[in-house]
């Protein structure tokens, strides 16, 4: 439903759709945004936030992080050079990348792998931040693990996120951090 609204109703976007999760977006200084949304009146066991200075895209409130879908929030820093390949793959499965930001496509990739395919988050990390082939072939993984990682690299090659990045995923009862393979 969220993707349909964001795709079909011109100028309308659903930015927060999770149970027991709120997303607040704005362009401005953090202290002004906090006052505007009266964040001091909320309680939570975890928060994700992002201060963004856009370098490649225009700054607008819809592009502000975190990006959310159902019970996931994603914030990221970096430059995702695989955006077009990632977007083309994920759009084959009904997702629409209307906001044209790499964080949006990361959120949809995580949703697709974890929620729709039932892949555990540890394996999601192995897909989107997969080891280099040379690392896979180095013998540092068990035979079973090597086979699993090879399978992910072959089947989900279009979901490998490339470029320098760090990602924080917030979800019900947890946080997960990922970074590119060169760090």
Model-derived regions: residue spans:
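Conserved short alpha-helical segments that host acidic/polar catalytic motifs at enzyme active sites
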Residues: 1-182
